[in-house]
Amino acid sequence: MTALDIQISVEAGDWPPEDELQSFSEVVLEAAADFLAREERQPLSAEAAELSLVFTDDQSIKAINAEWRGQDKPTNVLSFPAFPVTPGKMPGLMLGDIVVAHETLRREAAELEKPFDAHLTHLLVHGFLHLFGYDHIEDDEAERMERLETRILARLGLSDPYGDLPPV
């Protein structure tokens, strides 16, 4: 399994304790990295690649979203790759940053009738794929990214977030 050095920062919001977020995130992102290495032949280029996770609130992510994407509203997750990478290529030692907003995550989980942890898992996987160059701007890119998310989540015992299919 690939080693990830995950730095956690709880900036704002009613998040679980930092040590719980750390161990939870390690399980999720190690599974995603292992999947990409084995199934997509996109391994990390270093023994221990680094990324940071920022757990924050809607107010903070709204400001980040406005500054970096020109959208003056909160969103669930934002990813900032350290370096440009395209799907199928190996990322460098520094992967980048993933920022998750608590209120949006909780609201979406309730609307989707999904457990908070399941939706957080999905958003972490989604953000992680962005660090590897995957995107969802074009329909074909979105379909590929959704398939990858679904397969990674299935490995973690979670159902398809885009449908009602049970885990494979």
Curated annotation (Swiss-Prot):
Binds 1 zinc ion. InterPro entries: MetalPrtase_cat_dom_sf_prd, YbeY, YbeY_CS. It is found in: Cytoplasm. Zn(2+) binds at H126, H130, H136. GO terms for cellular component: cytoplasm. Its cofactor is Zn(2+). Pfam families: YbeY. PROSITE patterns: UPF0054. Transmembrane segments: none annotated. GO terms for biological process: rRNA processing. It comes from the Bacteria. It is an enzyme of class 3 (hydrolase). Gene3D superfamilies: Metalloproteases ('zincins'), catalytic domain. SUPFAM superfamilies: Metalloproteases ('zincins'), catalytic domain. Its EC number is 3.1.-.-. The keyword Glycoprotein does not apply. One of its GO terms (molecular function) is RNA endonuclease activity. Keywords: Cytoplasm, Endonuclease, Hydrolase, Metal-binding, Nuclease, Ribosome biogenesis, rRNA processing, Zinc. Belongs to the endoribonuclease YbeY family. Single strand-specific metallo-endoribonuclease involved in late-stage 70S ribosome quality control and in maturation of the 3' terminus of the 16S rRNA. HAMAP family: Endoribonucl_YbeY (MF_00009). This is Endoribonuclease YbeY. It comes from Sinorhizobium medicae (strain WSM419) (Ensifer medicae). The lineage of its organism: Bacteria, Pseudomonadati, Pseudomonadota, Alphaproteobacteria, Hyphomicrobiales. The gene is ybeY.
